[in-house]
C-alpha cells in the first residue's frame, strides 16, 4: 500500500509528513529497532491512535519515506528527460539525486534495510506496469517481474556500494565486463 497518497486533507497530509520526518530524524540518531511508535508519538505530542490513523506500523512509515524519495527521484528525471539529455547526463542526474539522499542511504545501510528499499523500488516500478510491458515488448508478467527484480537489485546494490565508497567517481569504459 502506498501511504504517500492524498490522505484527504491538507492537515492530514501535513501530519503524515510530520510523522515521516520524525521517524527519519530519529533514525539519523538511533538504530531502527530502538525507535518505537511511542517515542515518535511523544516527540510529536500525538497519541498512538493518531499515529495508527496514518500508518499501520513503523515499517509502513519508513516505506512511505522511501516511496516519497523514489517519486521525487523519478519526477526529477522526467523533468530532465523533457530537455533531451544525453545518457551520461541522465545517469549523472540519477546518481546526483542519490548522493543528495546520503542520510537515507546511511539509515538503510546502518539498519540493514536493503530488502525494504528493494521492495519499495519494485513496488514503485510496478505502479506503471503496463508502460513497462510496452517498453519491454513482452506480455509475460513473470518475465517482467524477473527483469524488474534483477534491475532493482542491481541498481540498489550499485547505489549502496557507491555510497559505501564515499561517492568515489564511477568510471565506465567500453569493453569492461
Question: Language model features by range: what are they?
Answer:
Residues 36, 50, 104:
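Residues in the helix-turn-helix
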Residues 112-156, 176:
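Amphipathic alpha-helical packing segments from all-alpha helical-bundle domains
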Residues 14-25, 43, 60-80, 89, ...:
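Alpha-helical structural segments
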